């Protein structure tokens, strides 16, 4: 694919849009870490490492100095990635998606290794050969005609690490916004506020284009603090202590509100597979690929590597120097699906568990429910009757967190009537909804939790059927007209959160009443619009999904054990 064109910034913009659900405000966290570094870091050691990184040749003691300082920085920061190796199996992703991911990781591995060891040059790292051996090898390559005399590496500089254990270099490079900002303020003699203002403008420019050295020079006239940023072209494996343009741009991306900047993505084990699935979808739409050409990573390669390095934390901006292994080591693709769990024996008087979830899926649901705060306002709504619900939504407006899932109905005739006059869900769109989700969610809800609802009868019956008489419901009792004041605005803002209400909904023809809305009723949208009626506005903040998308539906050929 070396002849294909990388539309770098267009890809970046597409990734920003596609992965916007996992971007979050990080400015406060970054500045808190910045202040911690300013007060606790020895900048004499920082200056020493910066001098070392400017040298063409480095040895074991230099690597030890870099690793020690990285460990000190990591201990002062709260934004750090933790070692969470991920194991992806059929079920969390389809077999085709797993094969695509595995292939891309292998291609990326080959590219990175070729980039670090460019043929015929000293490269960034050349195994555990000594400097003398490297020099002698270069002479031999010239003698047999493979390498031209006087040839050096890319950018005209040979960077050599003369170390025995190359694994100690892994994850010791790369910039962190908190470190970049603290170095600019402390070593540049600038106030923290001036640095933040300058980098914010650089970040705003980054929403429209990749800032280059000419842009940096122009912005430096307005913000003199930016003059400490190096005017050199980007290189492979430069230290996070070097004030490069790319490091400054990354810091700027974290200081602006909005923009869906990739740098602000945060993942954890419950959202990892969903993020990967979405990434592959964006890749397909934009025809992204892993290039075979050695050198800097393109936007898709970059985010793929960062996501797969660790399943928990901020892939772009956190301290990751304590992570062991690389992306292809820490994200393992397994093509053999786990055997289904044997059904639990039914005791006398007990109700059978229909469509039980596998332990790992049940654990993800439990973690999702634990993401709710028991003491906050919590809306709940269902579509379908309480004895045969087809959709459940639970929404907390203060945190914008929500649980949302579907269920295949048992009574198909009744379902089709409700679809025509109410929710607009088509049977084919919930045919493969994973059984057991609604029951599992209700089972793990905190004891005596209070819910807010528009109409309590159906919700109470649903809770009672699951033996949860301890759960309490507050009925707001809005009129039909009141409840839908914000309907159009809510659908306009958040329709991307729900794509299962595709059917045509027919207006009501009851005598003496106005025709009902022709918009389909969605449990999640209803929760958001009911809350908007009570507070008087629709929040701009993006709702945050607590259940991974990939567990909501199963593969069509999956057998359900009853």
Swiss-Prot record:
Keywords from the UniProt entry: Capsid protein, Helical capsid protein, Host cytoplasm, Host-virus interaction, Hydrolase, Inhibition of host IKBKE by virus, Inhibition of host innate immune response by virus, Inhibition of host RLR pathway by virus, Interferon antiviral system evasion, Manganese, Metal-binding, Ribonucleoprotein, RNA-binding, Viral immunoevasion, Viral nucleoprotein, Virion, Zinc
Source organism superkingdom: Viruses
E.C. code: 3.1.13.-
Annotated Pfam families: Arena_ncap_C (PF17290), Arena_nucleocap (PF00843)
Binding site for Mn(2+): 381, 383, 526
GO biological process, one term: symbiont-mediated suppression of host cytoplasmic pattern recognition receptor signaling pathway via inhibition of IKBKE activity
Signal peptide: none
Domains as described in the record: The N-terminal region is important for the cap-binding activity while the C-terminal region contains the 3'-5' exoribonuclease activity. A CCHE zinc binding site is present in the C-terminal region and may thus contribute to the substrate binding and/or the specificity of the exonuclease activity.
Family, as annotated: Belongs to the arenaviridae nucleocapsid protein family.
Name of the molecule in the record: Nucleoprotein
Organism: Bear Canyon mammarenavirus (isolate Mouse/United States/AV A0070039/2000)
